[in-house]
Amino acid sequence: MSILSFLLGEKKKSASIAKERLQLIIAHERVGGKAPADYLPALQRELVAVISKYVKISDDDIRVNLERHDDLEVLEVKIEIPQV
């Protein structure tokens, strides 16, 4: 966020906020090693809240999964969006 946008009170878009949160989570996991992913339920709830602003979905329509294979971590997010 630049100083000008801070002073003018411009709001960040939800996509950029979500991107920042995911970057923080990934950075935290890399520093913390192989700690369990206890943030996944909270991440799933937040994703449902954000997506629900635009499309009607329920908690069952989204799946968040973290898989670890040696030195590789994959965060998988599956979202079922109803047809219009």
Curated annotation (Swiss-Prot):
Annotated keywords: Cell cycle, Cell division
Domain of life: Bacteria
GO biological process, one term: regulation of division septum assembly
Protein name: Cell division topological specificity factor
Keyword Oxidoreductase: no
One of the Pfam families matching this protein, by short name: MinE
Family matches, as InterPro entries: MinE, MinE_sf
Family membership noted in the UniProt record: Belongs to the MinE family.
Species, as recorded: Paraburkholderia phymatum (strain DSM 17167 / CIP 108236 / LMG 21445 / STM815) (Burkholderia phymatum)
Function as written in the Swiss-Prot or TrEMBL entry: Prevents the cell division inhibition by proteins MinC and MinD at internal division sites while permitting inhibition at polar sites. This ensures cell division at the proper site by restricting the formation of a division septum at the midpoint of the long axis of the cell.
Gene for this chain: minE
